[in-house]
Amino acid sequence: MDAAVASAPIETIGNILTQTDKILEEIKPDAILIYGDTNSGLSVIAAKRRKIPIFHMEAGNRCFDERVPEEINRKIIDHTADINFALTERAKEYLVAEGISGDRVMVSGSHMEEVLEFYAPQIAESDILNRLSLTANKYFILSLHREENVDRPERIRELAGLVNALSEKFKCKVIVSTHPRTRVRLEAQGLQDNDVFMPPFGFFDYIALQKNAKCVISDSGTISEESNLLGFPAVTVRDAHERPEIMDAGGLVMVPLKTDKIINAIEVVTKLSIKNIDPVLDYRGGQVSRKILYSVMSYIDLVNRETWRKRQ
């Protein structure tokens, strides 16, 4: 699907729909399972036109700010899907409030705990700290990629200034896992330092870096789940947030991309004990993959029968 990426978001979405439709025509799947809220999730439109049952993981997340492109995607995907799997009870409540029938929404919980447990040996074996000459609790890991943070020149300059400010204030090394989108914006501003702005890390290395960092600064959605499950201090750099349950648990601090606010947040989260953070119960419990698998297998026939009037 990388070939679908274009210079303009609408062109990318058009390419996704065209290419997905060709794949669906070729393989004729019994169902399609969509995860998340990225542009690729809009392939639900192609699947719907072909009368293919659609299941959506991570449904019902809402930040209630339609300036965020992912918020628009979430609503389109949720309302197009036949069955929605919500991470939390609150996410289900949002969907029901929007008019989606409660019997088409299931609370699956987060798959992240299961993923982290399954890959724990590989994460433990990561030698990324040695390769980067890092000492545990003596560095920051930073990753920003969202439109609100990197698509305006002044925000990119703020990001570059933030890296220098963190290094000077805390006397720690700053490692930036640089999303391709962010790198393009940095290069356009003439801001390049390959010792700081590194290519994206693989999953095992990145989790190992997060677990051992003094603090993680990120605009990723999954930082909420990872910080709560693994117990590391984190600051999320966002103007709006779609996972309020982590805020309820006191699991992280949300601030905009302003250097002084981020530094203040880091000072707070690194001083308070992270061992006493309330667990988000919906993030825990495991066996999410089994729940999803069993539900998909169980509901394909129902969707075909009730939505598309197909008879076996």
Predicted regions and their residues:
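C-terminal amphipathic helix plus adjacent low-complexity
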Residues: 271-312
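Active-site and donor-binding regions of nucleotide-sugar-utilizing enzymes
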Residues: 1-101
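A nucleotide-sugar donor-handling region in carbohydrate enzymes
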Residues: 4, 77-155, 255
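Donor-nucleotide binding loops and adjacent catalytic segments primarily
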Residues: 124-213, 310
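Glycine-rich phosphate-binding loop signature in dinucleotide/nucleotide-binding domains
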Residues: 23-30, 134-135, 212, 299
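A donor-sugar binding/catalytic signature common to diverse glycosyltransferases
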Residues: 33-35, 41-44, 56-57, 84, ...
